[in-house]
């Protein structure tokens, strides 16, 4: 329901031609393996992948954060209880953010939304490495509630604006979900090594710096708007 508020362009009425033109249009709009593979030839696809490589670090950050947070309290029981409160508050704020994010993205644009989410993510990680005490760490973790809704909504809208709309679900699964999982799997052992060797705070500083670097570079790589003329030829459906 939230994503339906995204106004990504005018909806075109289906073309109906004599002699079963509507069936021909449906046939032509089907996605083939060749259509999906053609994404690999698009520079803007790899630009999106580059951004995702940096943004998916937040999953690795969240994996061991409970251990770091609980360690800030005198007892494990007290720390675990406080983390439960933290997690509950964060979930409610994220839900509220999902209602506000489409309104924001429709005004600042999908690219700016992605950059904003990436920068907030970097600030959150770097802040977790700089601040001390459970209260400040509690606050830095809550920033995630402002970051995640903007990231998700911006990603959906960016994909819809800049790629063949027939491939939007494929792009989201491969370009965002799958890539995040694969990169997270590769980064997790490195993060674990950092936790054991130099500690949580220095590792968070490194992770935040990586996110900042990839997000800053993405300012020049991501496309500012949806240019339909730049879509691959396969997105053009001609009905005789």
Model-derived segments and spans:
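C-terminal membrane-cytosol helix-exit motif in multi-pass small-molecule transporters
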Residues: 1-16, 215-223
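Juxtamembrane intracellular "pre-TM" segments in multi-pass secondary transporters
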Residues: 8-49, 235-240
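Short amphipathic helix-loop junctions that connect adjacent transmembrane helices
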Residues: 63-83
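Helix-to-loop junctions at the C-terminal end of transmembrane segments
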Residues: 96-110, 195-196
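Structural signature of the two symmetry-related core transmembrane helices
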Residues: 112-127, 205-208
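Intracellular juxtamembrane helix-capping segments at the cytosolic ends
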Residues: 150-164
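A late C-terminal transmembrane helix in Major Facilitator Superfamily
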Residues: 166-197
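A membrane-interface helix-boundary motif in multi-pass transporters
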Residues: 190-211
């Amino acid at each position: 329901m939230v994503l339906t508020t995204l106004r990504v362009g005018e909806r075109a009425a289906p073309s109906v031609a004599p002699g079963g033109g509507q069936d021909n249009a449906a046939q032509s709009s089907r996605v083939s393996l060749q259509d999906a593979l053609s994404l690999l030839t698009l520079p803007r696809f790899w630009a999106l992948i580059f951004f995702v490589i940096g943004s998916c670090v937040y999953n690795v950050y969240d994996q061991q954060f409970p251990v770091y947070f609980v360690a800030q309290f005198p007892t494990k029981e007290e720390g675990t209880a406080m983390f439960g409160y933290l997690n509950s508050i964060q979930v409610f704020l994220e839900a509220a953010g999902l209602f506000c994010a489409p309104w924001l993205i429709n005004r600042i644009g999908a690219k700016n939304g992605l950059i904003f989410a990436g920068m907030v993510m970097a600030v959150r990680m770097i802040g977790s490495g700089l601040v001390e005490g459970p209260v400040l760490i509690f606050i830095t973790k809550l920033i995630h509630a402002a970051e995640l809704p903007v990231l998700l909504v911006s990603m959906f809208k960016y994909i819809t604006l800049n790629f063949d709309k027939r491939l939007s679900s494929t792009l989201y699964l491969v370009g965002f979900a799958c890539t995040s999982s694969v990169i997270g799997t590769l980064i997790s052992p490195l993060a674990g090594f950092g936790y054991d060797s130099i500690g949580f705070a220095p590792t968070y500083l490194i992770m935040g710096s990586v996110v900042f670097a990839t997000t800053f570079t993405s300012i020049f790589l991501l496309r500012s708007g949806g240019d339909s003329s730049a879509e691959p030829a396969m997105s053009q459906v001609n009905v005789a």
